[in-house]
Amino acid sequence: MKALLILGLLLLSVAVQGKTFKRCELAKTLKNLGLAGYKGVSLANWMCLAKGESNYNTQAKNYNPGSKSTDYGIFQINSKWWCNDGKTPKAVNGCGVSCSALLKDDITQAVACAKKIVSQQGITAWVAWKNKCRNRDLTSYVKGCGV
């Protein structure tokens, strides 16, 4: 009985961790979801952004005390402007999506929201892109992935 309880807890912890993509797996997924070259942003730039924001982890979540908002998912999409978490004051929900949807292993909704953000504000909407990706050689993010 004790072994079943421990097994159950282990399985629960695995389920809560979410998916951390391998580099080439994410590159292929983002390409298949139409991000390669979307609004002039290369796949390598999207990969660098995802690495800098979440380390390719779909469950990444970071609270911002100043704005009382939270960043969600692989692209760290903010609850003040882009998604609804039910607790951020004066949230806009520009993507019309629940923030919990941005934490799913299936990143289709996260990509759709990222497309909306980049369409309206450009890739510079993400601080991690400005700090870690802009004006850098990003070829290593897609090298050897066959994309």
Swiss-Prot record:
Gene3D superfamilies hit by this protein: 1.10.530.10
Annotated catalysed reactions: Hydrolysis of (1->4)-beta-linkages between N-acetylmuramic acid and N-acetyl-D-glucosamine residues in a peptidoglycan and between N-acetyl-D-glucosamine residues in chitodextrins
Keyword Signal part of the UniProt annotation: yes
UniProt entry tagged with the keyword Membrane: no
Entry-linked Pfam families: Lys
Subunit structure: Monomer.
Family: Belongs to the glycosyl hydrolase 22 family.
Function: Lysozymes have primarily a bacteriolytic function; those in tissues and body fluids are associated with the monocyte-macrophage system and enhance the activity of immunoagents.
Protein name: Lysozyme C, tracheal isozyme
Organism: Bos taurus (Bovine)
